[in-house]
Design a protein with these regions (language model features):
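Flavin-dependent oxidoreductase catalytic core characteristic
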Residues: 1-253
Length: 253
C-alpha cells in the first residue's frame, strides 16, 4: 500500500462484510450436523453459536460495508490500471504507511489490476465457469446499469454488492494460489470455485427477484446462473485432505 496504491480501501470493508457473514454460515452448517448437541451448555459451540451473530452487526456491519465497496465497481470492472505483482511478505520491516495512510476519500478514483488476467492462468473447470458468470455481470453493469433509484435502494445494492464481493474474493484467491502454489492443489482450487459458482448463482437469483429489477436486468441475472462442474474424484481427494486434519487441534480451556 502507498499513496498511489490504495486498493486496500476495497479489501478492508470487503473482509469485514464477507468474512463475518460467512462465519455465520459456517456455524449454521455445522449446527445442521451437530443438531441438538449444539444446545448443550459449557461447550465451545454453544458459545460460538451465540457470539458469531454479533460480528456482522458490529465489526462487519453489512449494509455499511457494501455501500462502501459498490463505489469501487466502475473502476474495478471498466477502468483497470497496471500494478506490479505483490510478493509474499514475511520479512521484518517497519510498515510506515500503516501509520500515515492519509484521508480515505476519493474511493471512486481508486484503480485495480485487470482481474481477468489472473483468471487466464488457471484451467480448472469451475474457475472457467466463474469467469463466464463475471462476464455476464459486466454486461449487466454496462447495458442494464442500475438507475438512480436503484443506486439508492439499499436492498438492491446489498444483492449487487454480494456478487461484486465474490468477484474480488475470487481474484484474491487466484493471486494467492500462485504465491502459495506448493500448498494449494488444483483439486482444492477447483472445489473452492465450486462453492463460488453456486454462491454467485444464488446471488444472481436474489438480484433477479428484487422488486425494482427491470426485464433486461432479470434476463441477465438468469444468464448468470451456472451449475458447477461435478467431479466425484476431486471431491473425494479434497475430503481426504480435510479428514486427515481430524483431531489435529484441541481447545485448551
Amino acid at each position: 500500500a502507498s499513496p498511489t496504491d490504495r486498493r486496500y480501501l476495497l479489501f478492508n470493508p470487503l473482509v469485514k462484510m464477507k468474512v463475518t457473514t460467512q462465519g455465520e454460515e459456517v456455524i449454521n452448517l455445522l449446527w445442521d450436523v451437530i443438531a441438538a448437541k449444539g444446545f448443550e451448555k459449557d461447550t465451545y459451540f454453544e458459545m460460538a453459536a451465540r457470539d458469531i451473530r454479533a460480528l456482522p452487526k458490529l465489526e462487519g456491519t453489512v449494509h455499511v460495508n457494501i455501500a462502501l465497496i459498490v463505489k469501487f465497481m466502475p473502476n474495478y470492472f471498466f477502468n483497470p490500471a497496471v500494478y506490479p505483482p505483490i510478493p509474499r511478505r514475511a520479512d521484518s520491516q517497519d510498515d510506515v504507511f500503516l501509520w500515515n495512510q492519509g484521508p480515505a476519500r476519493g474511493l471512486g478514483q481508486i484503480q485495480f489490476n485487470d482481474f481477468r488476467l489472473v483468471f487466464e492462468g488457471f484451467d480448472q473447470p469451475n474457475v472457467k465457469l466463474f469467469a463466464e458468470q463475471i462476464s455476464v455481470l459486466q454486461e449487466f453493469l454496462a447495458t442494464a446499469t442500475p438507475d438512480a433509484a436503484q443506486q439508492k435502494d439499499v436492498d438492491f445494492l446489498l444483492a449487487l454488492g454480494e456478487l461484486f464481493a465474490l468477484v474480488v474474493y475470487a481474484q484474491l484467491i487466484l493471486e494467492n494460489a500462485g504465491i502459495y502454489s506448493d500448498d494449494i492443489s488444483g483439486d482444492l482450487l477447483d472445489q473452492i470455485f465450486d462453492c463460488l459458482v453456486r454462491d454467485f448463482s444464488k446471488g444472481a437469483l436474489t438480484l433477479y427477484g428484487k422488486s425494482s429489477s427491470t426485464e433486461a436486468q432479470m434476463a441477465l441475472c438468469l444468464r448468470m446462473l451456472r451449475k458447477p462442474t461435478v467431479d466425484a474424484g476431486r471431491f473425494g481427494r479434497v475430503w481426504e485432505q480435510v479428514q486427515a486434519l481430524r483431531d489435529a487441534y484441541e481447545l485448551a480451556w
